[in-house]
Amino acid sequence: MIKVHLRKIKLADINYFAKWWRDKELLKLTSGILKFISDQEVDKYFQAILNNKKDYNFMVIANRKTIGHISLVKRQNNWHETQIVIGEKKYWGKGLGSKAIKILIKKAKKNGITKIYLEVRPINLRAIMAYEQCGFKKVKRVKHRKNKYLPETLRMELKTCTIDINKKTPL
C-alpha cells in the first residue's frame, strides 16, 4: 500500500515545478497554457509560492517520493480554493490525489476552514471523479471569457468539511 503525506514546500522543490510547468500533457489538464515557461518565470512564480505565508502550500509525498503539489488559498467570504497537481504521471489513477485531498481537508478543518471549492477543466474526468470521492459536488460551469487558455471551468464545492479528524482512516 502506498502511504501518502503532505510536507511543507521548500526551495529544492523548484525542480519539480520546472518539470511539471513544462509538461504539455499535464498543462492541458490544468492551466491550458502550452507556451514555454523560462527559468526566470519558473523562479518568479515559485518564489511567490514559497514566500506566501498566508496560504497553505504542500508537496504531495507517496512512499517518500515527491509526486505533486497541493494548495489551499483564502478567497472571499471565508471560501478557500484548493488546487492539486500530481505531476509524476506514473502515479496517476492510483487514488493518491484523493488521499492528498482528504489529508488537506483534515488540516483545513483543524484550522477552522469549512468552505472549500475548486475549479477544474471539464475535460479532466479523472480529477472530477477524485474530487467527487472526496465529497466535492458540482455546482456550476464558470466562463472565463478573457482567458483564451482556460475558457471554462467546472466549480465544485465542499461547503462543510465532514471528515472526522479523530477517526483513523487508512491513508
Label each PLM-derived region with a short phrase.
Residues 1-35, 43, 161-171:
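A short, well-structured alpha-helix characteristic of acyl/acetyltransferase catalytic modules
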Residues 12, 37, 77, 125-126:
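Short alpha-helical
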Residues 16, 81, 99, 115, ...:
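Amphipathic alpha-helical recognition patches that constitute DNA-binding helices
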Residues 17, 104, 113-116, 131, ...:
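Hydrophobic packing within well-folded, soluble alpha/beta domains
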Residues 35-91, 101, 107, 160-163:
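Acetyl-CoA-dependent GNAT
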Residues 88-90, 94, 122-123:
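Active-site acidic-Proline motif in GNAT/NAT acetyltransferases
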Residues 93-107, 129-133:
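Conserved acetyl-CoA-binding loop-helix of GNAT-fold acetyltransferases
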Residues 114-117, 121-128, 137, 141-171:
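C-terminal "cap" of GNAT-fold acetyltransferases
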